[in-house]
Design a protein with these regions (language model features):
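A short, amphipathic beta-strand motif
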Residues: 28-36
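A short tyrosine-centered beta-strand micro-motif
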Residues: 87-93
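Structured interaction patches on ligand/partner-binding surfaces of diverse proteins
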Residues: 96-125
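Short, surface-exposed beta-strand/beta-hairpin micro-motifs centered on an aromatic residue
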Residues: 74-83
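Sec-dependent signal peptide recognition
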Residues: 2-9
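Short solvent-exposed capping/turn motifs at the termini of beta-strands
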Residues: 36-38, 44
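C-terminal motif of bacterial Sec signal peptides marking the signal peptidase cleavage site
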Residues: 14-17
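Short amphipathic beta-strand segments in non-cytosolic proteins
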Residues: 48-70
Length: 133
């Protein structure tokens, strides 16, 4: 009887130990696009808007808010984070803070989306990130 319990306990621990945390190493994908609104130097007047290439998109995961990786958007504003495990993720992009109307203000804010990947092969397509430039 002790032998059977020991074997069951061993397999239970083995299954728990095999659970992969959020982050790289899986087959899931997070993708989306970044849309920019270009304002005048004071942040009042909208000059143009477009999907922006070359913009940094950041990812953090699990209970940690530290940036774990980043990618740049393609010319059409699209981005992808590939090969992710199941877990909790935060995707964010920096945006100019247009609530401050000072000429050429460099103050930025983070535009953040949080999500969970619940299956191994899941692909999550996010709503567009809208940022101010």
């Amino acid at each position: 009887m002790k032998c059977v319990l020991s074997i069951l306990l061993f397999f239970a621990v083995l299954l728990i130990a095999c659970e992969k945390p959020a982050g790289p190493g899986g087959k899931a994908v997070i993708k989306g696009k970044v849309y920019a609104k270009n304002f005048d130097s004071y942040g009042y007047t909208l000059i143009s808007e477009y999907y922006i290439g070359g913009e940094n998109v950041y990812i953090s995961y699990g209970s940690d808010n530290a940036v774990r990786n980043n990618v740049k958007t393609s010319d059409d504003g699209s981005f992808e984070f590939l090969y992710l495990n199941k877990g909790h993720y935060r995707i964010f992009v920096e945006s100019r803070d247009t609530s401050i109307h000072v000429k050429n203000s460099k103050k930025t804010i983070a535009v953040v989306t949080e999500l969970d990947i619940n299956s191994v092969n899941q692909t999550v397509t996010l709503s567009d990130f809208v940022i101010n430039k």
